[in-house]
Amino acid sequence: MGKPTGFMEIARQTSTELPPEERIQNFNEFHIPLPQDEQQAQGARCMDCGVPFCQAGMMIGGMASGCPLNNLIPEWNDLVYQGKWDLAVHRLRATNRFPEFTSRVCPALCEAACTCGYTTGSPVTVKENEHAIVEYGYESGLLTACPPPTRTGKTVAVVGAGPAGLAVADYLNKRGHKVTCLLYTSDAADE
C-alpha cells in the first residue's frame, strides 16, 4: 500500500455526469472522468486490508459480497496510486476477461464490501478506478483486439451468452477455434 493514511486524508471523489438533457442528444460518453492525478489520489484511499472483502466474491448471509470475479482490487488500486498504469492494466486483465464493459455495467459489489466504507462511510472508488484503468489501456494501446495467429478449423458452440459463456467463447477463440454463442430464450417469458 503506497499511502497508509490515504483513506483519512483524501476525500472520495467521483466523476461527474452530463445532465440527461445533454445525454439524449448523442451516444457519446456521459461520464466526465477525473483528471489522472485526481484519479491516482483516489487509488491512495485503498487501505489494503488484511482481509480485502472487496475482492472476496462470496456469499455472506445469502447476499453477494465483494467482486464475483475476484479482481485483485487492492493491487490495482495501489498501482493506480503509484501511476503504474501499464501494470494496473495487466493486473486487471489477470482476473477479468472483459474489463472494457464490466467497468461500465458492474454494480460495484466491491464498494459495498469495502472496509474503508465501513470505517469512514465513504468506500474507495473502485468502479471508477477500474474504468480509468480500462480507458488508459485503450488510449495506450494495451487493450486491443487480439485475433489468434492461426485457426484450427474447428467450430465450437457455446450455450449461453452471459459473462461465463462469453468468457469461454473468448478463451476458445484465442485458441484458434471458430465460436458461435447460442442464447436460449423461452417463448413463455414473452407472454
Regions found by a protein language model. Name each.
Residues 1-155:
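Ferredoxin-type iron-sulfur electron-transfer modules and their immediate structural context
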Residues 157-178:
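N-terminal Rossmann-like FAD-binding beta1-loop-alpha1 element of flavoenzymes
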Residues 184-189:
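Conserved small/polar residues in nucleotide/adenosyl-binding loops
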